[in-house]
């Protein structure tokens, strides 16, 4: 919920009487971030739970990883996930604004109004040209409807087979978000529909590499539990938790825009003369921060 004060949107809650009564789509899953002292208290509480009380396989693995500082890795299931990929890989991500009131034709209250996407193409394992294979689209203006231009940029940067299917695999984290936005754009622009849906139909979710997908791993040993666990995950698999485990040098901490909410607040304050997050003072600075984040 946002309030508008002194020409700038903020994260403060609006008054109850200003809330819309329209039925809103299911919100995206939010990560629970605990203060350091609360996390430490939780850790102490975990140690007080007797192993004899734990019957669930997931809980036993989590406790073992916590007690012994080890990692749980199901190599068989993870290998199977990789075998489903077809190159090139399109690392794809959207940013959207859940606007309370529809901004443009075809949108709904609290629907995701997309304003940015990033695409990084991995031609073969580890092969990605820094200039040619990296593309970011970011709306130039807040009040202009640039969705058609965005949709055209998407289909122009993916490759297709002669039969119209996607050449390769679209890759993302919690891919249902990206697939939903592609479907919405396909409904808006029938001339782009076939290619947008072709992208949707050949996708792989990084979440299923580390967490689980019972349907995908049906018939395999341990099909009902996660594929990877580390004590620092604390039960969650958001990219903000998993990325630092594998590439410690990459982190969202300290970024001018470091999460989805900050991203759309920077976007809707494009032309504000008030500082955003006490750092971003100009539109150019906000745009650059959004590009780095996405």
Predicted regions and their residues:
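Residues that form generic nucleotide/phosphate-binding pockets
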Residues: 48, 64-66, 81, 153, ...
């Amino acid at each position: 919920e946002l309030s508008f004060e002194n020409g700038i949107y903020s994260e403060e809650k609006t008054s109850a009487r200003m809330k819309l009564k329209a039925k809103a789509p299911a919100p995206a899953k939010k990560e629970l971030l605990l203060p350091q002292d609360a996390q430490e208290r939780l850790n102490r509480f975990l140690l007080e739970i007797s192993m004899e009380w734990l019957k669930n396989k997931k809980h036993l693995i989590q406790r073992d990883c916590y007690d012994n500082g080890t990692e749980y890795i199901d190599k068989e299931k993870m290998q199977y996930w990789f075998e489903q990929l077809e190159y090139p890989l399109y690392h794809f991500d959207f940013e959207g604004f859940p606007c309370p009131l529809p901004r443009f034709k075809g949108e709904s209250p609290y629907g995701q109004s997309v304003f940015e996407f990033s695409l990084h193409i991995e031609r073969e394992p580890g092969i990605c040209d820094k200039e040619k294979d990296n593309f970011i689209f970011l709306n130039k203006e807040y009040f202009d409807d640039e969705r058609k231009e965005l949709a055209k940029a998407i289909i122009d940067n993916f490759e297709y087979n002669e039969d119209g299917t996607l050449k390769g695999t679209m890759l993302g984290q919690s891919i249902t978000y990206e697939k939903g936005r592609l479907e919405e754009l396909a409904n808006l622009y029938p001339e782009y529909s076939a290619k947008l849906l072709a992208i949707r139909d050949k996708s792989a979710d990084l979440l299923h590499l580390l967490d689980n997908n019972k349907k995908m791993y049906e018939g395999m040993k341990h099909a009902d539990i996660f594929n990877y666990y580390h004590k620092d995950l604390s039960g969650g698999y958001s990219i903000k938790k998993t990325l630092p485990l594998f590439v410690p040098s990459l982190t969202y901490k300290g970024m001018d825009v470091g999460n989805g909410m900050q991203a759309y607040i920077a976007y809707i304050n494009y032309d504000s003369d008030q500082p955003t997050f006490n750092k971003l003072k100009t539109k150019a600075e906000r745009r650059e921060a959004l590009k780095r984040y996405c």
